[in-house]
């Protein structure tokens, strides 16, 4: 386990373990976090000011193909945390990290799996019954079942300015370039978090 909570607190002073977090909640009733937002009319990744990852312009390098075989690298959790902080901003969101270290996979490996073996994007969108959070939770399950130890989870975020909406997608750490990408499970697009337009609320890995 690469992550020591005392060392982590030196980098991120607001770090809590689960017991410390639960101790700060009300003792006589649960703390309920409820989604009270409207979902966007189209996935936010399709906005003009969003940087999509272009796999045609960035083909899989030969070095990444070589890394697809053999033992995978073990990534310290602090690397993932620092990459998330760099991508989303320094704070004002909750980040739940369940593991002290992760197994390193690349964006090209994940894209190959999603493109060839996953069909979450073909599911029908049904308000309330199967909407954005359901899409992201289903894809998270499929990906984590296939790529053991992958730093792949779910993020909830919304706009910094009106009109207000909220959205849930997947979040992924690509170890080959030490970078965070969001993954829209409704259309399989990989994109960067737009810190100028959006604010993160919660991330769960």
Where are these regions (language model features)?
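A structural boundary/capping signal
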Residues: 2-205
């Amino acid at each position: 386990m690469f992550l020591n909570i005392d060392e982590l607190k030196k980098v991120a002073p607001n770090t809590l373990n689960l017991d410390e977090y639960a101790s700060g909640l009300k003792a006589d009733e649960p703390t309920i976090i409820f989604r009270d937002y409207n979902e966007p009319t189209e996935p936010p990744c399709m906005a003009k000011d969003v940087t999509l990852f272009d796999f045609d312009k960035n083909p899989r390098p030969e070095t990444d193909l070589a890394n697809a075989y053999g033992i995978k690298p073990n990534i310290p959790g602090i690397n993932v945390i620092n990459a998330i902080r760099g991508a989303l901003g320094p704070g004002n969101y909750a980040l739940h990290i369940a593991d002290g270290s992760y197994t390193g996979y690349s964006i090209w490996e994940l894209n190959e799996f999603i493109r060839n073996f996953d069909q979450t994007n073909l599911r029908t969108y049904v308000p309330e019954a199967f909407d954005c959070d359901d899409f992201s939770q289903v894809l998270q399950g499929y990906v984590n079942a296939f790529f053991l130890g992958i730093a792949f989870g779910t993020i909830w975020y919304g706009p910094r300015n009106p009109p207000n909406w909220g959205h849930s997608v997947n979040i992924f750490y690509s170890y080959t370039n030490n970078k965070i990408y969001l993954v829209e499970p409704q259309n399989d697009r990989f994109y960067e978090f737009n810190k100028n337009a959006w604010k993160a609320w919660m991330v769960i890995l």
